[in-house]
């Protein structure tokens, strides 16, 4: 008998930084309130930029404080609030790169969300850099993510593509067993929900959920598509070292994907430990 449990809920107040674990949350149309509500703008190259272009962001962590303010911790342990007047200078110094921190702006402010200048004039080379793919490895199918070619995130959000990303403990365990020299720690993959699945022998159970509805607590999610992984999964984060072999294993063992994207079709409260049903 298939049994699915919501094991962990994670929120990431600042795009590309480590986040915080939640016991419960009220899911809205845009997913978890406060998730990816801040992002950094590259003041050297232009555009909102995450760790694909500024890898050191993944060494920082953030948690939500009062009133939606983000408390950011640098790798050296120092703290700064998103509302502090010196936040941009502080972040730029710690990142060793000029940036500014931005809250979400209205969706019609398209220039704010438009991608900055590419690092390469060769479009395929740029994509291979973003997705960490070698010349002999296939690029991911981006047909379901048309906005990502023009915008860093869907305008009005700082998500990569959809409000929620889900993964299973089984997928991480599968990759760990097949590639024991790399650490497939959930912190590399920044899922909002991590599920534990019992009663399935699927290597990557969540891939079978695409096109179906997931009922958890009072909420209902529509599982939209797989999550193609990018170079961020190879960067150092917390106590995990930089490891480009993570992408080699992902491509070989899982077509470069891990986890699935979801939309909220019914808003409601969810709690860690709840049993989940798939329709």
Language model features by range: what are they?
Residues 1-279:
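Metal-cofactor-dependent catalytic cores
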């Amino acid at each position: 008998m298939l049994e699915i449990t919501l094991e962990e809920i994670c929120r990431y107040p600042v795009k590309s930084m480590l986040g915080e674990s939640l016991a419960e949350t009220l899911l809205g149309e845009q997913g978890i309130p406060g998730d990816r509500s801040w992002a950094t703008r590259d003041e050297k190259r232009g555009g909102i930029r995450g760790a694909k272009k500024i890898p050191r962001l993944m060494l920082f962590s953030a948690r939500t404080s009062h009133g939606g303010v983000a408390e950011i911790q640098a790798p050296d342990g120092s703290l700064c609030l998103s509302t502090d007047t010196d936040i941009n200078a502080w972040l730029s110094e710690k990142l060793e790169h000029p940036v500014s921190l931005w809250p979400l702006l209205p969706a019609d402010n398209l220039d704010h969300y438009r991608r900055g200048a590419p690092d390469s004039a060769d479009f395929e080379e740029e994509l291979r850099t973003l997705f960490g793919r070698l010349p002999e490895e296939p690029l991911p199918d981006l047909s379901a993510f048309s906005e990502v070619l023009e915008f860093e995130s869907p305008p009005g959000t700082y998500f990569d593509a959809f409000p929620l990303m889900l993964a299973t403990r089984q997928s991480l365990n599968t990759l760990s067993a097949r590639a024991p020299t790399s650490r497939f720690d959930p912190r590399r993959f920044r899922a909002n929900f991590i599920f534990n699945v019992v009663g399935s022998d699927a290597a990557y159970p969540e891939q079978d959920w695409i096109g179906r509805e997931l009922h958890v607590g009072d909420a209902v999610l529509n599982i939209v598509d797989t999550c193609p992984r990018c170079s961020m999964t190879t960067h150092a984060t917390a106590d995990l070292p930089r490891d480009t072999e993570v992408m080699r294993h992902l491509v070989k063992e899982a077509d470069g994907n891990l986890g699935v994207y979801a939309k909220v079709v019914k808003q409601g409260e969810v709690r860690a430990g709840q049993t989940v049903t798939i329709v």
